[in-house]
């Protein structure tokens, strides 16, 4: 049986560009397309309270394989292009979700 995973991503966005970056994600349907993927259980962005230039993302996938497939899809490639324009740093962490 595949182990579900939790992925957390923290983007440090160029000064004053956080809202524009998030709006581009929404306007391009990247968040909706990611949520619609088979194997996705959660894909939500958050504004952290400790930084005005960071944007956080929480993802839950049914398996590492499902998340890996996500990174090959066109909307992920759009996100990669947006990151090149808006993002200074990315911290990504992956956690296995234990069976209940």
Protein language model features and the residues they cover:
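Short amphipathic alpha-helical segments
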Residues: 17-41, 75-80
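Compositionally biased, intrinsically disordered low-complexity segments
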Residues: 28-29, 33, 63, 90, ...
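Residue-level signal for secondary-structure boundary sites
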Residues: 17-19, 65, 100
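Glycine-rich beta-strand-turn "strand-cap" elements at beta-sheet edges
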Residues: 1-6, 41-53, 78-100
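Short, well-ordered beta-strand segments in beta-rich or mixed alpha/beta enzyme
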Residues: 5-12, 42-71
